């Protein structure tokens, strides 16, 4: 293949096919198509691009015209533009629907990130995010895009998609005027997509439907469009078909952001009000706060005031995220950026708080601020007791970045010193545990997760209890309440029965079921949060072969018949194995735990009873038989009275040993039983 030696870049160049290449009539007809209609793959084949309904040419290996667009858009990103030319938007998507890939492509096409610096999941900084394919810590990026010769500033505020971080998502959406609703064209609407769309609608955002992965063989875009219209109620007549991986439809998305998402209100003359949507701890500069200016303006050197925490600081540095931090002189209404003010604790600059000027305070803070409330608790103990100080230091460092993480010291007779930790949900708990083990080289034992119970005492007091060992005695408590959640399950119709059976097993209360498509149903249940902190999600995926998805939200506390189940080994209570269960499940849980302990505890010289008790009542029991020592082996006959004397002496010794003997439960047994507790609860 030969190309013209001199190319005039002002007009699109053309390919000239050699004589050996024109044997095919179809190739001869294409011999004068411009280079912008082709993309050269690594295997050196040329592919014709469909530019009709599927969108623009791929931008993955940017063509000549695409490179010029990126250069024009990416240059001078820091130049000020009128407020009418600012667009703040977010991307809403279920896990694995292509949110991070689309964000990467937007950064690349607008020239925000150069090709040489580009990598997959560019905005996902943590290794854990890349491995799991999820967004944990949200990011923001400022892009410059030229539309009809007019420069626009596009602020992408990335969001975590998981339900554990729904509060952070709501604050991110509150900082935007619009959102891209990204749905996989081969999978359709999923549960967490619905949850975040409802949050966007509550914030009155302009939603642009985007159907991703249209290049997949199993893509059914028309069917998914109908699903979006029926389930969510959005008008999909202007939905955009795209493939973030192949770069199809990216320009259409950028144009739609400019055309359809409204500009921020021009309120630069009002007192400063800025919404914090994220923060993290920098060891050299203190807490770096990401915020959106709603009213007024802020510049370096201003004395700022955090309205929820009541703390004030001087702004040492103000800048924008593009996506790296770049200092600017000031930020005004509608803009998104960061501020460094030598804040020493993330707790002083919480997500959802309002920043204002110390000397000219705003009359009211921005609505929607909430304190992060842990919903799931578990104990973390180092396998090596010498690592306790390291665990404390690691938790303190993590807490600098994660204000939702709570912990307090805890002591166990079996596992030594550790911490009782509170988390937003199960994913949050898994992420913290994995980061402790990976980033701080700690080897940890995790107790069975529990939720926060509300205990009403006979004297009228109400206390919160997350640790079974702190549950008051039955005579002192009037009632116990547990948190309930509303859970929505989206599943193919073939697995409806399996999911309903699972929910009924977990004390679920059926509310409604509706078909959102010909072969997909939405099932609504209310069930205790405690029933979800075990293996509920694993069972959900297992029983539906991975096709079902779920979304849940806490709806409050309800009174339940809850009891404390204790495990006694040789009449001694083992506190770490105590748990709070519903009375109806006490026997099955107790039986499973005692049987597992019988398998794992080494046999002793005396008989060891293993009991599951409610108060003083034993509901399940197993016995570990004694190792028999043959004391008659040395007797080669003789009088029977001699043998009786030896046997009697042995029995007395075993009785004394049983009274004073101590049974040590090995570490492996603890870990296996704690894992079993997570499965059976």
Swiss-Prot record:
Reactions mediated catalytically: GTP + H2O = GDP + phosphate + H(+)
Biological processes, Gene Ontology terms: positive regulation of translation; translation
Keyword match Hydrolase: yes
InterPro entries in UniProt: EF-4, EFG_III/V, EFG_V-like, EFTu-like_2, G_TR_CS, GUFP, LepA_C_sf, LepA_CTD
Keyword terms: Chloroplast, GTP-binding, Hydrolase, Nucleotide-binding, Plastid, Protein biosynthesis, Transit peptide
Entries under CDD domains matching the protein: EF4_II (cd03699), EF4_III (cd16260), LepA (cd01890), lepA_C (cd03709)
A single GO cellular-component term on record: plasma membrane
GO molecular function, one term: GTP binding
EC supergroup of this enzyme: hydrolase
Assigned EC number: 3.6.5.-
PANTHER family linked: TRANSLATION FACTOR GUF1 HOMOLOG, CHLOROPLASTIC, TRANSLATION FACTOR GUF1-RELATED
Function recorded in the entry: Promotes chloroplast protein synthesis. May act as a fidelity factor of the translation reaction, by catalyzing a one-codon backward translocation of tRNAs on improperly translocated ribosomes.
Protein name, per record: Translation factor GUF1 homolog, chloroplastic
Organism this protein belongs to: Arabidopsis thaliana
């Amino acid at each position: 293949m030969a190309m013209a030696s001199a190319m005039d870049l002002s007009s699109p160049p053309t390919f000239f096919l050699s004589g050996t290449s024109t044997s095919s009539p179809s190739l001869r007809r294409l011999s004068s198509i411009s280079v912008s209609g082709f993309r050269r793959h690594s295997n050196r084949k040329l592919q014709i691009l469909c530019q009709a309904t599927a969108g623009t040419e791929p931008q993955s290996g940017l063509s000549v015209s695409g490179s010029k667009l990126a250069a024009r858009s990416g240059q001078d990103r820091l130049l000020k533009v009128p407020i009418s030319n600012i667009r703040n938007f977010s991307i809403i998507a279920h896990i694995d629907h292509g949110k991070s890939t689309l964000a990467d492509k937007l950064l690349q096409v607008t020239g925000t990130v150069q090709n040489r610096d580009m990598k997959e999941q560019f905005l996902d900084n943590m290794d854990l995010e890349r491995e799991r394919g999820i967004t944990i810590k949200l990011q923001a990026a400022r892009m410059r895009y030229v539309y009809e010769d007019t420069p626009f500033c596009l602020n992408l505020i990335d969001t975590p998609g998981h339900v554990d971080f729904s509060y952070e998502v709501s604050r991110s959406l509150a900082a935007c005027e619009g959102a891209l609703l990204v749905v996989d064209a081969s999978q359709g609407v999923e549960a967490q997509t619905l949850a975040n769309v409802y949050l966007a609608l509550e914030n009155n955002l302009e939603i642009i439907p985007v159907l991703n992965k249209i290049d997949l063989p199993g893509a059914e875009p028309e069917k998914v469009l109908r699903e979006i219209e029926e389930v969510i109620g959005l008008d999909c007549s202007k939905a955009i078909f795209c493939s973030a991986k192949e770069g199809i439809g990216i320009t259409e998305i950028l144009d739609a952001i400019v055309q359809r998402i409204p500009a921020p209100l021009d309120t630069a003359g009002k007192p400063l009000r800025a919404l914090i949507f994220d923060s993290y701890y920098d060891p050299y500069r203190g807490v770096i706060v990401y915020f959106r200016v709603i009213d007024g303006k802020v510049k370096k050197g201003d004395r700022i005031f955090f309205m929820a925490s009541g703390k004030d600081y001087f702004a040492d540095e103000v800048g924008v995220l593009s996506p790296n931090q770049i200092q600017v002189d000031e930020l005004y209404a509608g803009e998104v950026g960061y501020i460094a003010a030598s804040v020493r604790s993330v707790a002083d600059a919480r997500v959802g708080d309002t920043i204002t000027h110390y000397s000219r305070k705003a009359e009211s803070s921005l609505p929607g601020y909430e304190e992060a409330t842990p919903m799931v608790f578990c104990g973390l103990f180092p396998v090596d007791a010498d690592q306790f100080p390291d665990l404390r230091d690691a938790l303190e460092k993590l807490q600098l970045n994660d204000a939702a993480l709570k912990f307090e010291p805890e002591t166990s007779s079996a596992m030594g010193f550790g911490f009782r930790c509170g988390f937003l949900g199960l994913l949050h708990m898994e992420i913290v545990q994995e980061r402790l083990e990976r980033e701080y080289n700690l080897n940890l034992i995790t107790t069975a997760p529990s939720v926060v119970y509300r205990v009403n005492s006979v004297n009228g007091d109400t206390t919160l209890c997350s640790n079974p060992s702190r549950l008051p005695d039955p005579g002192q408590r009037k009632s116990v309440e547990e948190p309930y959640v509303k859970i929505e399950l989206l599943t193919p119709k073939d697995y409806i029965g399996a999911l309903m059976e699972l929910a009924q097993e977990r004390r679920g209360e059926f509310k409604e079921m509706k078909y959102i498509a010909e072969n997909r149903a939405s099932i609504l249940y209310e069930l205790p949060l405690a029933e979800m902190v075990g293996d509920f999600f694993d069972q959900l995926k297992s029983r539906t072969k991975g096709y079902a998805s779920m979304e849940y939200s806490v709806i409050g506390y309800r009174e339940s018949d809850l009891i404390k189940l204790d495990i006694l080994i040789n009449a001694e209570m083992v506190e770490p194995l105590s748990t709070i269960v519903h009375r109806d499940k006490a026997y099955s849980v107790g039986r499973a735990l005692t049987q597992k302990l019988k398998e794992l505890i080494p046999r002793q010289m005396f008989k060891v009873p293993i009991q599951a008790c409610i108060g003083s009542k034993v509901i399940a029991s197993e016995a570990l038989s004694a190792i028999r020592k043959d004391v008659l082996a040395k007797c080669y006959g003789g009088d029977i009275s001699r043998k009786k004397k030896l046997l009697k002496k042995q029995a007395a010794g075993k009785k004394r040993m049983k009274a004073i003997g101590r049974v040590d439960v090995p570490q492996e047994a603890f870990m296996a039983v704690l894992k079993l507790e997570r499965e059976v609860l």
